[in-house]
Structures are given as C-alpha cells and as structure tokens.
Amino acid sequence: MQAHELFRYFRMPELVDFRQYVRTLPTNTLMGFGAFAALTTFWYATRPKPLKPPCDLSMQSVEVAGSGGARRSALLDSDEPLVYFYDDVTTLYEGFQRGIQVSNNGPCLGSRKPDQPYEWLSYKQVAELSECIGSALIQKGFKTAPDQFIGIFAQNRPEWVIIEQGCFAYSMVIVPLYDTLGNEAITYIVNKAELSLVFVDKPEKAKLLLEGVENKLIPGLKIIVVMDAYGSELVERGQRCGVEVTSMKAMEDLGRANRRKPKPPAPEDLAVICFTSGTTGNPKGAMVTHRNIVSDCSAFVKATENTVNPCPDDTLISFLPLAHMFERVVECVMLCHGAKIGFFQGDIRLLMDDLKVLQPTVFPVVPRLLNRMFDRIFGQANTTLKRWLLDFASKRKEAELRSGIIRNNSLWDRLIFHKVQSSLGGRVRLMVTGAAPVSATVLTFLRAALGCQFYEGYGQTECTAGCCLTMPGDWTAGHVGAPMPCNLIKLVDVEEMNYMAAEGEGEVCVKGPNVFQGYLKDPAKTAEALDKDGWLHTGDIGKWLPNGTLKIIDRKKHIFKLAQGEYIAPEKIENIYMRSEPVAQVFVHGESLQAFLIAIVVPDVETLCSWAQKRGFEGSFEELCRNKDVKKAILEDMVRLGKDSGLKPFEQVKGITLHPELFSIDNGLLTPTMKAKRPELRNYFRSQIDDLYSTIKV
C-alpha cells in the first residue's frame, strides 16, 4: 500500500496538506499532542534500562577441553586463568602505588571519634607513615625478606593498613591475630609463626601477651607496639620479663630518623599468613602470596569492569575483620583504584551511625547482617496494610530484577525503600556478600530494596577469599555464580554421599593463581587440602546449574552415619531449618548407634513471641522456650520446611530441645568466623542430647 493510500484509508490528509490539517486543529488538541510527545520522549530517555551483562547469562562458564570436566569463566578468551588485570600491579605494594597516582594524592584512610566527622589521611601521608614503620622495623633488626613475620593484633583501624603497607614496602609478611581467637589459639599462632614483634591496638592485648611471656608460653616474643595510650606500669611489666613495650608514635619517629629505601616484594613472595579458625584443633596458617591476592582482586575487577569501575570517588566502610581474606581483598581493590576507606568506631552497635556519617558507596557484608536487616524491615511492617504495601513494592522491584534492572529511583523506592537506603548512608552502589550461605529469599528482597549492584561470592581462605562470583546482570539467587576469571573449578566424586561428577555434582575443587601455597609448617594438612596436581579440595559439595553457575548443596567434612548406614550432612539440614520464622540457630546431631536425628534449637528472640501469639501461645521468651506445645509447633514448622526442601525422612529431626541462649564466640560454641564448633556443641548439650534419645521412641 502506498503512503497516500494509507492516509486516505485512515481518512487523514496527505503530507502536502498536513500543514493545513494541523492549522485546523484546536489549540488544546495541539497542546495535548505536544505534552504527549514530551512525556514519551522523557520516558524513552529516562526509562529503566537493564544492566548489560558481560557475557551470555545462559552460559556463564565453559568446560575446558581435556581437564576432566573443569570449567572456566566465560569472560576469558582462552583457557588460561587471569593473573593480573593491570600490567603495573603484580604485588600489593604496586597496587598501593597505583592508588597514590590515580587518586592524585586524595584521601585514603579515615576514622572518627564518637559524634565527630571522619578525619582523613591522604595517600601520600599513608605511604610516608608506612615507610616510617617499615624503616623502624629494620632499625629494630628485622629482615627485609619474605620469611620475616610481623604480628598484627588489632581491630580494623588506619594503623592496621599503615603497618601492612609498611611490611609490604620492605618484603615482610604480616600475621593477623583475631580479636576473638582465645588465649590458647593466640599463644599457638605466636609460637607457630615465631613472632618476636606484635602490634596491638589496646593495652589489654599487650597485657594478654605479657601474661603469656611471664608464664613461659610464648618465650620468643620480644617487642610489643601499642597503638593506644598506656601507662608506665605496662612498660615496667614488660621490662621484668624481657619484653620491650613501645608506642606506635615512637616507631614512626624511629623510622623517620632512619629512613630506608623500600625493598618491594616479588609476586611469588608471601604477603600474609592467614590463620583459619578450625572447628576442631589448632588454627592452620594459610600461606598467601602477593600473586594470590592480586589475581583474586584482578578477577573481581575483570568480572565487573563494565559495571562497577571502582574509582577515587568511592568510599568503603571497613568493619568486617581485616584478619579475614574477604575484607582484605575488598580493601586491596579499593586501594588499587585510589578510593577512600573509612573505618567503623570499633563497636558494631554504632555501625549504623558510622554508615550515616561516612555515606559509603561500597558495603561488603556477611549473611548474618543481611538476616538482621531483613528481619528489622519486616518487623517494622507491623500492620496488615504496611505488610501488604511492603510485599507489593518488593514484588514490583523483584520483577525489575528479573529483567536485569537495578535502580533506587523508582516510585517504590521513594515511597517504601528510601528509609532503609538512607540508613546505609544513601549512596551505596555496590554490595558483596560472602563467608557463609545466604538465603535466596533474603538476598532477592535486599537486592530489590537497596537498589544497588549486589553480588554474592563463594570461596575460602585457601583460595584467597573468592573463587566464584555472581555475574553482573544476573540477579537471580540460589547460586554462587560462575568461576572467577582467576581460577578453574571442577567437581569430583564423593561416592559415600552418592555425588557423582558425571551427573554434575561433587566436591568443589579449585585451581589457579589464587590458590594458596599450603599451611605453615604443616605438610600433612597441606597434603589433605592440595592434591599433587595443585587442586584445592574445599570440602564443599557443589552442583553445576544449566547456565554454568555453581550451587553449593552440601558439606563433606561434617558427614556422619546413622545406625542404618545412611550418611548425614548436618549443615545442609541446619541451613534449611533456619528458614523457619521462629528459629535463630540450629544444631543437628546424630550418632552411629542411633537411628534418627535430634536438634538443639535457639529461638529468635525478636520473632518468637509474635509468632507464638499468632498461634495462641502467651508468655515471655523464656516461658515460651519451656512450653512443650511451642516446642511441638516449632518442630512441625521445621519438618514442613524440610519436606518442602526435599529432605529425606531419615534427614528430618525427630525431636528438639529449645535453648534460650544464642551460640556465640563468647560461650565457645562458634568460631570467630561464626561457624559452629560441633564437638563443643556436642559436649555442651550432652545431657539434653541423652534426654532426647532416651525419651523419643521411633
């Protein structure tokens, strides 16, 4: 059909008459056309656009030919893992030097006192202080060599990074000590790493170390450097047992008066001995090189290069322990790009205040914090109308997520989610979670509510924090993403649990430049973790999904048999049961002489009372924990969830005891990384376990 025929068909004038036709239209009509055109143009220009993924999201990893089923990131052009993203950054020392340049000597490390703004040190100030500390160490007789270990026993603060960079500038190695490791583990690490000098933040930690020297438990310790103010009695106590107690300021002055030229490390040199807190036995010292850390950082930058682009305008809130590799990798990425790092005040209860003042753009988190945020948001929706609005708004935003759209400027953000976004400072554009599994429900909701790029990672200390990461544009939950560009991942058979690699299931194994060098002075443990071909065996059970992402489905290390011979993986069962609304923590237990499982359940103090009230139960939290009918109702809810999640009948617990006190680091039932200490839990609840087995008849 010709154009003039088309106009005639719709009874419209031909183009030559169009001007005359427009003149005959009423002014209101013309204004309406103009407004419609303007609105259409505005919508087209500002409509939400999905984040462009860096690869085909239906195939995020690729099998490597001749590798026994190993898969690599689809972002790579070859089967060789990525080692360095920037040619001039092959060590953490070089990464910091790059940060000095790209930041144009901008602010680097910030801290604050209560009710005060953040005060900042510039990149060059940090570099100068770092070289002073490193020079002071040399003046004290320490070697510029990758077998020279220096201890850091402190919470996150600017001095932590200054000491770290001071060690790196002169090829020394840092050995972080956890605040919550406990006296025995600290003594073990000081001796294992042969630490003769330890930096501490508070006098109380210096006293703890001096006590070990006085009791001849750590005879090799000779110098303690204290960051905070302390009294003369601490110096005198040290002198009596042959330990020099000095201040951070004195070390800076000593180094300033005796400056040495930096002696940077090689990529293959050790950077950190990261002691992992095992659930049994002594901590193991993972030996991690500069190459390990830089390759892991490079992989994150590669995976997000078109979406995140860290820059000097970014600000990181530092509150997750720097003694853990997750936080260390995040901070190394920030420093390499000239970004700012603001430290929390040291009290997790003041974190929300720190967030409001700092207004970070980058916020790494752990699932425990996400669960609290989720519970708090839904706890505030305390009427039927508020709950309906929250559900409706989250579903609208989750629909956008499924289309790949991430934003924080929708109608629902302004009406519903603005408050929670503002509570984090109002500028967060990047969040990363790792260290433990996170509920798909919680992750999806918070991705929608917070309206920022929110990635989930998976890994462990032995592969320098991360080996898998969710892909930009893939905002689905329930998996840990594809292999990072720095490593390959393969699954191997676990016959005793009926997981077969040929069926896409098995133990997760990792190989690449991010895999550690072994455990310090422990060849037997190293051989358990690293096979002869260099594959790290994680102990986690994974499953390949059709789109090439990995789902963690089980845990190998804590399996046990029941009397009938069935293998049980308790952590998988616990993760399912903890989805129950009134449940905060669960310890699932079984024995080879018993035919069924039981559990110790810690109810959620914030939700139990309201949950019980809806079911007709009244009383305080402690009274409800003693109520047999409440216990029965919670057990029924757990079993329902287990059935819905596909647990086999023998994987379901047959009885529970309600315990009102949370498992914690303080009571010795959790490790510093918040993992259950199963032997300690077994001993702690021995009488309750025996009672359950004696009273339940199956």
Curated annotation (Swiss-Prot):
Organism lineage: Eukaryota, Metazoa, Chordata, Craniata, Vertebrata
Xref: Gene3D superfamilies: N-terminal domain of ligase-like
Cellular compartments annotated: Mitochondrion outer membrane; Peroxisome membrane; Microsome membrane; Endoplasmic reticulum membrane
Entry-listed glycosylation sites: S135
Name of the molecule in the record: Long-chain-fatty-acid--CoA ligase 1
Residue intervals passing through the bilayer: 25-45
Catalytic reaction(s) noted: a long-chain fatty acid + ATP + CoA = a long-chain fatty acyl-CoA + AMP + diphosphate; (5Z,8Z,11Z,14Z)-eicosatetraenoate + ATP + CoA = (5Z,8Z,11Z,14Z)-eicosatetraenoyl-CoA + AMP + diphosphate; 3,7,11,15-tetramethylhexadecanoate + ATP + CoA = phytanoyl-CoA + AMP + diphosphate; hexadecanoate + ATP + CoA = hexadecanoyl-CoA + AMP + diphosphate
Pfam family of the protein (one): AMP-binding
Species whose genome carries this gene: Homo sapiens
Cofactor: Mg(2+)
